[in-house]
Amino acid sequence: AADQATDTPTNNFCTLNPIFVGNQSTPPSDGATYMSDNGTNQDVSYAGTMGVTKGKWYYETYIDMRSTSYGLTIYVGYHTFKNNYRANAYWSSTNQDSVALYGMHTGQYWTWNGGSRSVTSGLGDIGASGVGKYVGIALNLDDNQITFYYDGNAITNGSNLALNNLGTDTDAGIFAIPAISVYDNNHTVNFGGYTKAPISSAQSDENGYGTFEHAPPTGYYALCTKNLAELG
């Protein structure tokens, strides 16, 4: 039988957009939550179906595996896709769109600041022990900050990071959209609706929406139509 999401007629959750995929990549599967790139040796970029310009939002991703050749070459965060939504790599030095991305294998945070790429090093990176764990992304557009989590805890030096250009964009009404880029890895996203990732704790946001492995931080909400109508 086909996979089915836990949406209802009155509440739909964000998924990965199958027509919003860069670099000849395979469209997401399993309810548009699973990214299959292992063995391709190329950058594969994905984007969500919902965007936000204000409020506080949470989603998480599940580390299905780790490339034996390249490690966890996975970036997660947000993008505004102002110009080139089919960019092969969201972190490309030629891509002037605004990003806020955490690189799992490098422990780096990437944004654009003015006309230059800004790289913040010293965040915790994730090694082989990360397989089977979750990375959380908490976007705070009220204060133009982002925090990244690993296995339920804030990543070292990964709290309240400035959004730089992305925050400027959302202040101007340009939508920030969930963005994930992988290289030679398979990866699963959980926006709170259907996901193939294993959920053992079934945590929801403060409005009672979403099913997450780790509870969203206080004041952060799942990307779904009910929450967007009230908060986004």
Predicted regions and their residues:
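PRY/SPRY (B30.2) beta-sandwich protein-interaction domains
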Residues: 1-232
